[in-house]
Amino acid sequence: MAVVRRNILNNSSVRDQYIEGVKLLKNDFLRPDWPNTYDIFVIWHFHSMMTQTPPNSGSGRNAAHRGPVFLPWHRWMLILFENHLQRVLNDSNFGLPYWNWAADGELTPFQQKKAAIWANNCMGGSGEPVTSGPFRAGQWQVNIEQGFTPGSMDPTLVSVRRPLRRALGSGFPPKLPTRTEVRNAVRKGAPNVIYDSPPWDVNSAGFRNELEGWPDGPRNHNRVHVWVGGDMGPATSPNDPIFYLNHCNVDRIWSGWQQIFHNPKYVPNSSASPSLRRHRLNDLLFPVTESAVFDPIYQGRVRPSNLLDISSRYTYDTLTDL
């Protein structure tokens, strides 16, 4: 039976379960010689961003971002994260909640930083370190972050032991996307909408790039990362539990677009250039590492084509705002 993913601000039970679940994953070890389950997802996301597609290209495209696979790759990440939350919560009906940041985008910049999502009983507030809410200093620890090896300009993972960092509203522009901006992204090009197009990167026309947030304008998903700031900025952004609420809303917007326009086809298809490996319809999604070291997280050989119809897995409580 499909679970229902709900707005975290409309259901205190789901909110409390989510907070409990992510804390349980921080102390959950699938094997004694592995990092905790929560941090494995951080590692997976980091390596996806460090894997250029194709290698050494100038496109900026990587194995999970800046190209067509952005939406299905993160959809699969959310499904797996949701599965592990269900496991540690012992609740197979638990649905990953979302944060409708476009609703907060209707507030003034000052009000956005004081919105309900940042309350003490929800995600807590801003600060370096965060000093309020369930993920404040002493209650949540960042164990790995993006850093640099001495003498090298290539980012790497660095072991740390520190509190969570946020800098709400400190980026530019200092406000979240609005409902109108999201609706405009959903309906751009209607009725002849397209998912993506050449050159299949940050310069592409199509829904994926509008939602990911590379064209000039509202910048949608990207702007949320910048607006939250702190640990939401680098490739280790899943260190902040707000990451999953943000991406669940991104997935909700994609789901709404699929329904409104009757499942426009995913492109590029399987016959596209080998330089688009990892982004084509039937390419295997990037695993936790290239050698699948953490394969129990990855759970099999999954492709974008497997993730275009999610109706048997989950639904959203509403899409009417899109």
Predicted stretch roles:
Residues 1-322:
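Intrinsically disordered, flexible peripheral segments
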